[in-house]
Every structure is written in C-alpha cells, then in structure tokens.
A protein has these predicted regions:
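A non-catalytic alpha/beta surface segment that caps or lines the substrate-entry region
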Residues: 1-33
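Functionally critical mobile loop/hinge segments
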Residues: 117
Length: 122
C-alpha cells in the first residue's frame, strides 16, 4: 500500500490481501479502454528432501549454469515476481502515455486462483 500512497494512487485491498491499484489515463487517453496488468504475489517454496535451508528465514543458494540462474535444492521462488515488478514500473513511470490502468496483484494462484476471486475484479 505504501507504493500506492507514495504515488498518490487510489487502491483497494480486500480481506484476502489482493490489491488493485488504479492509475488514471494520461491526456488524450482518458476515454480509451482501461488496461489491466495482473500478477500474483504469493509463492510456494519447495525444497528437496535433503535440503537443510529454512525457507522462512534463510536465503537461497543460487548457482549460474550458462545463461540460467538456478536455486540449489529449492525452487527459485521468483515465481511471478516479474509481473509485479513490471506493473510497479509501469505505474511509477511518468513518461509513458497510457489509458487508465488497473494493476491487480493477487494471492492464492497456486490453489486455482480461488483467493484472487476476492478482488471483485476477476
């Protein structure tokens, strides 16, 4: 919510912790159809049976394999972070003409998007 507050955007957060941030269209695009950017914020941390990391407090052990970054013994955990980062970057930009934007950040994607339905936007 701090991001939305800091940028003066209207936002809603539902009881399931889904968030929608609204950014008005720029001049000339006010009457264009709204564009929704959606990403999920949650992740499921998975580790190999012999991995001793505590996924609640330890960092990941990363390794580079050619052009790939991999986590050793665990899921990488980035999951849909790129969608969240992309949406925040677009919202923060003040030099990109755009229609009204609704950035929808959901939780519970791994269980059939059941928790994302709480936004009232889906």
């Amino acid at each position: 919510m701090e991001f939305a507050k800091d940028h003066g955007f209207r936002y809603v957060q539902d009881e399931l912790n889904n968030v929608v941030i609204y950014k008005p269209g720029t001049p000339g695009y006010e009457n264009s159809p709204t564009v929704i950017i959606q990403g999920h914020m949650d992740m499921v941390a998975v580790k190999d049976a012999d991995c001793t990391l505590d996924l609640e407090k330890d960092g990941l052990l990363l390794e580079i394999d050619g052009d790939w970054v991999q986590a050793k013994g665990t899921s990488l955990g980035a999951d849909d972070g790129i969608a969240v980062a992309y949406a925040l970057a677009i919202l923060a930009a003040d030099d990109i003409p755009h229609p009204a934007l609704e950035a929808v950040f959901t939780v519970g994607e791994e269980v059939g998007l059941t928790r994302g339905n709480g936004t009232g936007c889906l």
